Swiss-Prot record:
Biased segments, Basic and acidic residues type: 399-434, 561-575
Gene3D superfamilies in alphabetical order: SH3 Domains
Protein's cellular compartments: Cytoplasm; Cytoplasm, Cytoskeleton; Cytoplasmic vesicle membrane; Synapse, Synaptosome
Positions of modified residues (Phosphothreonine): 298
Modified residues (Phosphoserine): 156, 159, 227, 274, 480, 553, 555, 565, 631
Topology term for the membrane: Peripheral membrane protein
Stated name of the protein: SH3 domain-containing kinase-binding protein 1
Annotated coiled-coil segments of the chain: 646-708
Gene Ontology CC: cell-cell junction; cytoplasmic vesicle membrane; cytoskeleton; endocytic vesicle; focal adhesion; GABA-ergic synapse; glutamatergic synapse; neuron projection
Domain SH3: start-end pairs: 1-58, 98-157, 311-372
Native species: Mus musculus (Mouse)
GO biological process, one term: regulation of cell shape
Keywords: Apoptosis, Cell junction, Coiled coil, Cytoplasm, Cytoplasmic vesicle, Cytoskeleton, Endocytosis, Membrane, Phosphoprotein, Repeat, SH3 domain, SH3-binding, Synapse, Synaptosome, Ubl conjugation
């Protein structure tokens, strides 16, 4: 039959449930899965949550029964007999009975509630049970109550056995049936109200001898005395079972009792005792002498043992916080001082300790062992939290029951994990590794700038500016767009190469060009003109476009330089500090130069002629370098509108030449570097292919070996 004691109140929510209160005992329990048990209380049977009660085990029942001393009635003593009844039994522990757990108070504690015990340092408490985490129930000086578990030190089994053996020695040292004066039965009264037992301490004789003494005194009283006339025989009678029946003494007219009036006109004296009685009843001095020394020497071994234990207790300090993953683990925070209980746990790498009244295991690499001379006495333990109010659990249970038809138990804690099996340890370790804190990670390194070559290759290029839209050009013939396309294609290629490889070149837009009202003069106006030669003009007619002189005549380097300086005259005038200009901008600037207003009708074809002029020198200079033209003049003999070019400094031209040469060098260097990198990548790729083939062969061999087995 299973029984359980109620630990928390619960109010029945349905008809088939039991209303239970703290302290009640539920009997005839039938355990069922799902968190609800069925039991009987006060004649009513119903369901109740299993986590609101604590099952009473057989061992606990025996302890409860052993605590109740057998109460037997005290028997009367015959009027003239100083012997005690053999049925008088003292409340002593049996020899074969083991004591319950005991603990010694390490810190004093004043009770905060009525059900708590007052603890003083050195008190010994008998533990009844662990009612709640951090709170135990025990007996101290006959009072049962609650006390905090972290204010005491539990005594081991050796000290309990020591106490039992000492009690056994005490019981052996005194005669059987020792009875203090406060527990004596009612004495027989003599004359003048004085008792026959006054001022004496008696002992119970052995059962066999007691029976003989009863028969002896009963025979003496039944036969009576000759001087007395034998009338006392009517006062006593002995039963068939040999035990003396204590009957009420009838008052007589005779003087005296038994042997006559022996106390007539004399003080009352006790009857002289026989030799057998003296042997059975030991003097008080002897018993006291044997009794006191063991009692005085008893606490010394336990105290010294406890002192040695407290001195050897180890402590450890938490250096990394850890959150408990299971119910039997401790949640530790950085800086906490944990009392170490056991280092040799079932699981390797885990220690058992106590913190704030709670015992559990924790990882040993999260703490640091403190030196043996560390003193924790100054750090008084904190009082554990009081027993949690059961209202929370009731609420958890009732709210869930309202929403569901079938009974669902209130939330109960998960079961403790079984660490005895070694195979469960690998599953535990990943959690530990995840939760284990480490030294703060080093911040990531700053991104290294890309390796620069010997020519100061830039690490990051600025974003390209959007190209300026070119206005529509009016072409007089179909050949002029071809020339413009050739020039624009060349400028686009050069612009792409330069923008990808250099950020030292300043990107100047056309927005920075400031128009000037001054008339510009061409630098070659003062040169002598050759007759019969057509100079390159700013505006070309249809006849001039059709003539082959534009494409067949050689273009001198001086003319190329003059065209470049003419195209950049706006930039040189507006910004003297500008040092670099892209070739693509040179070609674009040439097309954007407005023609000088003239009186001729040919001015309408200005944009087309400008684009053709801009593209033709570039294309001709690439194809026929090193040949000179007969006439560098821009003025035609037919009186067409003339352009007066701006005067540019020779230093700007030299800078442009140097930049072009530098760009060519950069391009060649980049080509060589790219070739080397491609070769290196190809060689690494070949090595990786070889490694992969080798691994594939090894895998195939392993597969074959496994299949053959």
């Amino acid at each position: 039959m299973v029984e359980a004691i109620v630990e928390f109140d619960y109010q029945a929510q349905h008809d088939d449930e039991l209303t239970i209160s703290v302290g009640e005992v539920i009997t005839n329990i039938r355990k069922e899965d799902g968190g609800w048990w069925e039991g009987q209380i006060n004649g009513r049977r119903g369901l109740f949550p299993d986590n609101f009660v604590r099952e009473i085990k057989k061992d606990m029942k025996k302890d409860l029964l052993s605590n109740k001393a057998p109460e037997k009635p005290m028997h009367d003593v015959s009027s003239g007999n100083a012997l005690l009844s053999s049925e008088t039994i003292l409340r002593t522990n049996k020899r074969g009975e083991r004591r319950r757990r005991r603990c010694q108070v390490a810190f004093s504690y004043l009770p905060q509630n009525d059900d708590e015990l007052e603890l003083k340092v050195g008190d010994i408490i008998e533990v009844v049970g662990e009612v709640e985490e951090g709170w135990w129930e025990g007996v101290l000086n006959g009072k049962t109550g609650m006390f905090p578990s972290n204010f005491i030190k539990e005594l081991s089994g050796e000290s309990d056995e020591l106490g039992i053996s000492q009690d056994e020695q005490l019981s052996k040292s005194r005669p059987e049936g020792f009875l203090p004066a406060s527990l004596l039965p009612f004495p027989a009264h003599g004359a003048k109200g004085k008792t026959t037992f006054e001022g004496t301490i008696l002992y119970r004789a052995a059962p066999g001898k007691t029976e003989g003494h009863r028969r002896y005194y009963s025979l003496r009283e039944t036969t009576g005395s000759e001087s007395d006339g034998g009338d006392s025989s009517s006062t006593k009678s002995e039963g068939a079972n040999g035990t003396m029946a204590t009957a009420a003494i009838q008052p007589k007219k005779v003087k005296g009792v038994g042997f006559g009036d022996i106390f007539k006109d004399k003080p009352i004296k006790l009857r002289p005792r026989s030799i057998e009685v003296e042997n059975d009843f030991l003097p008080v001095e002897k018993t006291i002498g044997k009794k006191l020394p063991p009692a005085t020497s008893t606490p010394d071994p336990s105290k010294t043992e406890m002192d040695s234990r407290t001195k050897t207790k180890d402590y450890c300090k938490v250096i990394f916080p850890y959150e408990a993953q299971n119910d039997d683990e401790l949640t530790i925070k950085e800086g906490d001082i944990v009392t170490l209980i056991n280092k040799d746990c079932i699981d390797v790498g885990w220690w058992e300790g106590e913190l704030n009244g709670r015992r559990g295991v924790f990882p040993d690499n999260f703490v640091k062992l403190l030196p043996s001379d560390f003193d924790k006495e100054g750090n008084r333990p904190k009082k554990p939290p009081p027993p949690s109010a059961p209202v929370v659990k009731q609420g958890a249970g009732t709210t869930e029951r309202k929403h569901e038809i079938k009974k669902i138990p209130p939330e109960r804690p998960e079961t403790l994990p079984n660490r005895t099996e070694e195979k469960e340890r690998p599953e535990r370790e990943p959690k530990l590794d995840l939760q284990k804190p480490s030294v703060p990670a080093i911040p990531p390194k700053k991104p290294r700038p890309p390796k620069t070559n010997s020519l100061n290759r830039p690490g990051a290029l600025p974003p390209r500016r959007p190209e300026r839209p070119v206005g529509p050009l009016t072409h007089t013939r179909g050949d002029s767009p071809k020339i413009d396309l050739a020039g624009s294609a060349l400028s686009g290629i050069l612009d792409k190469d330069l923008s990808d490889r250099s950020n030292d070149i300043d990107l100047e837009g056309f927005d920075s060009v400031i128009s000037s009202t001054e008339k510009l003069s061409h630098p070659t106006t003062s040169r002598p003109k050759a007759t019969g030669r057509r100079p390159p003009s700013q505006s070309l007619t249809s006849s001039s476009l059709s003539s082959p002189d534009i494409f067949d005549s050689p273009s001198p380097e001086e003319d190329k330089e003059e065209h470049i300086s003419l195209a950049h005259r706006g930039i040189d005038v507006s910004k003297k500090t500008s040092k670099t200009v892209t070739i693509s901008q040179v070609s674009d600037n040439k097309t954007s130069l407005p023609p000088k207003p003239g009186t001729m009708a040919a001015a309408s074809s200005g944009p087309a002629s400008l684009s053709s002029v801009a593209s033709s020198p570039m294309s001709s200079s690439l194809g026929t370098a090193g040949q000179r033209a007969s006439s560098p003049s821009l003025f035609s003999t037919e009186g067409k509108p003339k352009m007066e070019p701006a005067v540019s400094s020779q230093a700007a031209i030299e800078e442009l030449k140097m930049q072009v040469r530098e760009l060519r060098t950069i391009i060649e260097t980049m080509k060589d570097q790219q070739k080397r990198e491609i070769k290196q990548l190809l060689s690494e790729l070949d090595e990786e292919k070889k490694i992969r083939l080798r691994l594939q062969m090894e895998v195939n061999d392993i597969k074959k070996a496994l299949q053959s087995k």
